[in-house]
Swiss-Prot record:
It comes from the Eukaryota. SUPFAM superfamilies: STI-like. Disulfide bonds join C69-C116. This is 21 kDa seed protein. GO terms for molecular function: endopeptidase inhibitor activity. It comes from Theobroma cacao (Cacao). Belongs to the protease inhibitor I3 (leguminous Kunitz-type inhibitor) family. Keywords: Disulfide bond, Signal. SMART domains: STI. Residues 1-26 form the signal peptide. Pfam families: Kunitz_legume. The keyword Signal applies.
Amino acid sequence: MKTATAVVLLLFAFTSKSYFFGVANAANSPVLDTDGDELQTGVQYYVLSSISGAGGGGLALGRATGQSCPEIVVQRRSDLDNGTPVIFSNADSKDDVVRVSTDVNIEFVPIRDRLCSTSTVWRLDNYDNSAGKWWVTTDGVKGEPGPNTLCSWFKIEKAGVLGYKFRFCPSVCDSCTTLCSDIGRHSDDDGQIRLALSDNEWAWMFKKASKTIKQVVNAKH
């Protein structure tokens, strides 16, 4: 009887370990672009709605009325407009693959000269009382994971079969208390479509910004 019990416990331990190992691997699986390639840090991508046509265009740098700097994160209305390319940087600088559920910086790479001297790294702005929103803006800090840069770290999670959603729930500081929420689309008073913390996430996909980049990424595999 003791032998049978020991075998059952051993089997349970092995099964549990295998299960949790699988869950851990799934939680850290690579984010894939529209070509099915792993997202790479430092490579430029367009962030496009996973819903074509009525889903709108790509994410881009924008400006709020009466505020030239820092810039804000907006979505272009036309699905023919890819927006502004972004690059990703991991909190774990040793990993050059962008993975789901891990902390990343997201930084716009402007295609033209800017008037602002602020950074184009995404950050969660202070609460907007008039709009009742936590908007995603720019002027974040790249790298330096820790309590002083909490607002600059985002996560990418699966959303449906082909899409991904953005989430704010930084884990770069174990002792810090922080917000945890999905990120969705909301219109501001100017009618611009912006990103903000939301109970209703929006699904996105990532497209390489040029054929040259596609060739470089494919050469790594």
